[in-house]
Amino acid sequence: MLDAFSRAVVSADSKGATIGSAELSSLRKYVADANKRIDATLAITQNVSCIAADAISGMVCENTGLTQPGGHCYPTRRMAACLRDGEIILRYVSYALLAGDPSVLDDRCINGLKETYIALGVPLSNAIRAIEIMKIATVAIMTETNSGRKMFEGINSGSGAECKDIASEAASYFDRVIDALN
């Protein structure tokens, strides 16, 4: 995983050139958005357990057979595994968001996820639904559209309304995970 600065240096070095004005402009934007990235990542990390638990609960409410004997969230150790997986996905989304680079998500989370779930007999449609719910909740927290909670009040980045671009980026990382499972 390379941050924006490392990527610019590696790219310029591979070309045997100095860092160009387009790259510097991109780095300026990255620096300008740094507080928003930190605050958005904080929004995820402070709410990771709730986001994952709500997503798994939502998935189960939509398919109550999951918690019945023979269901994929029965017994409780399977439910715990679902919660753990949700938290892991959120963790890697937060890493990608902070770095502004999805490679850590691709390399350490997405790579082999579908094959692992298939091997374990996890219904991909249920996993995808849980990730969709996590995406919706995360974006709502970042943009402060979740039942009035003011995540960014008094924080450097301003308001959640000012973080829509970062929330959109976070949503794209969830979409990467969903696409990998399709």
Curated annotation (Swiss-Prot):
Q: Which residues are noted in the entry as (2R,3E)-phycoerythrobilin-binding?
A: 82
Q: Enumerate the CDD domains for this protein.
A: PE-PC-PEC_beta
Q: Which GO terms describe its cellular component?
A: phycobilisome
Q: Which UniProt keywords apply?
A: Bile pigment, Chromophore
Free-text description of this protein's post-translational modifications in UniProt:
Contains one covalently linked phycoerythrobilin chromophore.
A GO BP annotation: photosynthesis
Q: What drives induction of this protein's expression?
A: Constitutively expressed at low levels.
Q: What does this protein do?
A: Green-light absorbing phycoerythrin of unknown function.
Assembly and interactions? Homodimer.
Q: Additional comments on file?
A: Prochlorococcus does not possess phycobilisomes, instead it uses a divinyl-chlorophyll antenna complex for light harvesting.
The family note in this entry says: Belongs to the phycobiliprotein family.
Record-given protein name? R-phycoerythrin subunit beta
According to its UniProt entry, this protein's organism is: Prochlorococcus marinus (strain SARG / CCMP1375 / SS120)
Gene behind the chain: cpeB
